[in-house]
Amino acid sequence: MNIPKLRKQPIKKDCHGYTWEDDYAWIHQENILEVLKDGTKLLPEVKTYLEAENSYTKKQMRDTENLQKKLFQEIKGRIKLADEGLPYKDKAYEYWSKTTEEGNYSKRLRKKIGSNKVEVYWDGDVEAKGKKFFSTGDLSVSYNDEYLAYSIDDKGSEYFTIYIRRISDNKIIEEPIVDTAGGIVWSFDDQFIFYTKLDKLHRPKQIFRHKIGTSQKDDLLIFEEKEDSFTCSIGTSTDEKFYFITSSEHTTSEKYYFTHDEKIPQPKLFIKRKAGIEYSIDSWDSYFWMHTNDNAKDFKIVRCKHSAIGQWEDFIPAKDEVLIGGLVFLKDWILRSEKINALSKLFVRNVKTDHEEELIISDEEVISPGISLKQKDKNTDIVRVSYESPKTPTRTYEYNLKTKEKKLVKELEIPSGYNRDDYIVRRLNCDGHDGR
């Protein structure tokens, strides 16, 4: 079998004072975004070439087919196919996910707190049935627990379509919302959803508010990012009082906010964007909290009262050679992370006493710890913390912040077998070329 060849058609091009010939410029299609949505619009000659390349590759790799299968089975053997996530409380329900050995996608389940009746409110395998491609963007349950908003891409184009379904009877209640980035944010009163729409260059540039039960053509544009290198997104505050819009590029960000009771949202700017300055905002306990690298190479945390926006005070000041992470809020506790000498650490602060200390969950020398961000119940002393290390698969604990007692509630299983005691992990320090 001969190596597939794509015909050459020299086309002169110039840029920045240089001129050259591009033999394959003819492949470029002006309607490439339409091609992403509908593969039948791909140039027939290019499609034929790609199919020939695939056939050639398969033939050339034929001698390795048994090895490929062996490697695949070895990798697959390290994954527990039938698994169940830990339930987390969200208002009147507990939610969790589940996978099966025969399925390719997860199921989402819930049950009312105090009840044993389990509802499957999302089954990825059922949704994907009959589709050549299937990818879930977001799954979001309304605050009143009655509706599921979800987004899917069934073409591989990364254009997501949003659907809204009544959970009780699994019925889609309105027409789909097309050409979105996939993210979904419910309004706190369950009357609207917010979503980001992709522009003709596949960039998330516009944020719309959609009223449940109406047509997408009537959706309200509440924000548009017009600078080419910036994209936008929307989220909510921890205290469920504000919506936050983020406009950002790789090293610069800008935030806007509006309140839950604004009939027509009027996003208000926090701090004007400045090249190289990143910041994020949250709201809790009558304060706005900002995580920023403004005059803080490795970040700091400041806060201001809702009633005194802009009058920032240090909460966690910048530290030399210490990377400061964000905050997780509970009624009586504030948790956060730091990275010191390339090692991550967790810290917990008692809101009543203002005392802060390190939260230690393992005596291993090198670990990567984390805090569950699914925690919706804020009136608690118990949090889920986890860690993994070069020799320990992920372990998740329920940790009592008051008593410092911890309980192992889940450990990542390796079905093909693994013994962590077969390994030793040591951390060695040595000077670099700069003497540090």
Identify the residue ranges that each predicted region occupies.
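N-terminal pre-domain segments of enzymes
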Residues: M1-M61, K69-D83
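Beta-propeller blade signature
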Residues: L109-K112, Y163-S168, Q206-T214, Y257-D261, ...
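A flexible loop/linker signature enriched in serine peptidases of the S9 family
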Residues: T99-S106, A128-F133, I152-T161, P176-D179, ...
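Hydrophobic beta-strand positions that form the internal "hydrophobic ladder"
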Residues: E94, D145-L148, I193, Y243, ...
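A conserved hydrophobic secondary-structure block that centers on an alpha-helix together
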Residues: K117-I184
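Blade-edge beta-strand/turn elements of extracellular beta-propeller
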Residues: G124, I167-D179, T214-K226, K263-I271, ...
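Non-catalytic accessory segments flanking enzyme active sites
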Residues: P44-S140, S151, F230-S283, G325, ...
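Generic long, charged, amphipathic alpha-helical segments
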Residues: A308-K339, D421
